[in-house]
A protein has these predicted regions:
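ATP-binding/phosphotransfer module of carbohydrate and carboxylate kinases, centering on a glycine-rich
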Residues: 1-59, 63, 182-327
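Short glycine-aspartate micro-motif
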Residues: 4-10, 66-70, 105, 136-140, ...
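A generic "binding-loop/recognition-motif" signal
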Residues: 14, 110-111, 143, 274
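Short, acidic Gly/Pro/Ser/Thr-rich loop/turn segments
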Residues: 16, 74-76, 144-148, 207, ...
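Glycine-rich phosphate-binding loop and adjoining helix at the ATP-binding site
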Residues: 74-135, 167-176, 283-297, 301
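Residues on a specific face of well-ordered alpha-helices
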Residues: 94, 98, 112, 181-182, ...
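Glycine-rich phosphate-binding loop of actin/hexokinase-like ATP-binding domains
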Residues: 126-128, 132-195, 280, 286-292
Length: 327
């Protein structure tokens, strides 16, 4: 059984992580990450030539048969280029391939995060029934709101997964309660398009907090999303607590809408950097109740589990499985 050594990467606005992985040609053996990742500071690189020259120097003793990089930014239609969000750093598959002497594939970073979901090691289930090998929805509130669908393909070596990426985070935000309608009206005064990402990400939590302050008639403090989360979870600030309650409600509705839209009988997974930081709160919050409030389809969604992905670095794992599935 031939085994090849490949290179995968998770390139974000803050850090770029590169790691070797081993993939068998017939996929009879699960792929595995090899060694320790190389972690570089993305903002220190003004060009991809500088970045990949350092990567090549670090892995100079290794010859790669393929490479796949998950990058924080929209990949162009032909898959050949991407700009790392908030950095201006352009990455081209052809130039990276020349510098690293191997073929390079580019995918969006949430594409890789979604691919990592079926292989996550740390999961916490919130309600619903059994986790089935059926269509799965993935939501990822973090610096933005990623959204994707996982479709199973039952092959000779078990279930393989295809990621259907989307920009569902930019779908319209639909209020479901009078409170949410009031919040929406305040948000609409400051945002040309009030979408899910307007409230369901780090910056969105700040937007939601400021709108909540407007309803309370209080002045919004200059605080971070992390501080809002901390105050809300400890109940030391009633405005922050109600902000988190609203966040959980919007998240539950968005997760259920995704489940209904794609038929995610295999579960809706919540990944990204925010959920693990407020895990206990979300478990006891309106999240699950709002997920199940779907009128005639309440029984349908009641059987669908919500699963919190707690793995700290799913990007490299997802990139590895993306590369394996592309063979």
């Amino acid at each position: 059984m031939a085994v090849s050594l490949s290179l995968v990467a998770d390139i974000g606005a803050t850090n770029a992580r590169f790691q070797c992985c081993s993939i068998s040609e017939d996929l009879a053996v699960d792929p595995v990450l090899v060694g320790e990742p190389l972690v570089l500071s993305t903002p220190t690189y003004t060009t991809e030539a500088l970045l990949f020259t350092d990567v090549q120097a670090h892995f100079s003793a290794t010859r790669f048969t393929s490479a796949l990089f998950a990058v924080a930014g929209p990949v162009n239609l032909d898959g050949g280029a991407v700009e790392v969000i908030n950095t201006g750093l352009q990455i081209h598959a052809s130039e990276a391939g020349e510098l690293l002497s191997t073929a390079v594939t580019l995918v969006n970073d949430f594409h890789a995060q979604a691919m990592a979901v079926p292989f996550a090691q740390q999961i916490r289930q919130v309600g619903g029934g059994a986790v089935l090998p059926q269509v799965k929805g993935v939501l990822g509130p973090g610096s933005g709101l990623g959204m994707a669908t996982l479709v199973p393909n039952h092959g000779s070596y078990g279930v393989h997964w295809q990621v259907l990426p989307s920009e569902g985070g930019h779908a319209d935000l639909a209020p479901s309660t009078f409170l949410e309608a009031e919040l929406w009206s305040i948000l609409a005064q400051k945002h040309d398009h009030v979408c899910l990402e307007t409230v369901l990400c780090g910056a969105g939590l700040l937007n939601l907090y400021r709108a909540m302050c407007g309803l309370w008639g209080s002045e919004a403090e200059e605080i971070s999303a992390a501080e809002i989360s901390q105050r809300g979870q400890t109940m030391s600030d009633p405005v922050c607590h109600q902000t988190l309650e609203a966040f959980a409600g919007f998240l539950g509705s968005a997760a259920a809408n995704l489940a209904l839209t794609v038929g995610a009988r295999g579960g809706v997974y919540i990944s990204g950097g925010i959920a693990p930081l407020m895990l206990d709160f979300l478990v006891s919050s309106p999240l699950r109740r709002r997920f199940e409030e779907k009128g005639d389809l309440s029984d349908y969604v009641r059987e669908i589990p919500i699963l919190m992905v707690l793995d700290t670095q799913p990007g490299l794992t997802g990139a590895m499985y993306c590369l394996a599935e592309a063979r």
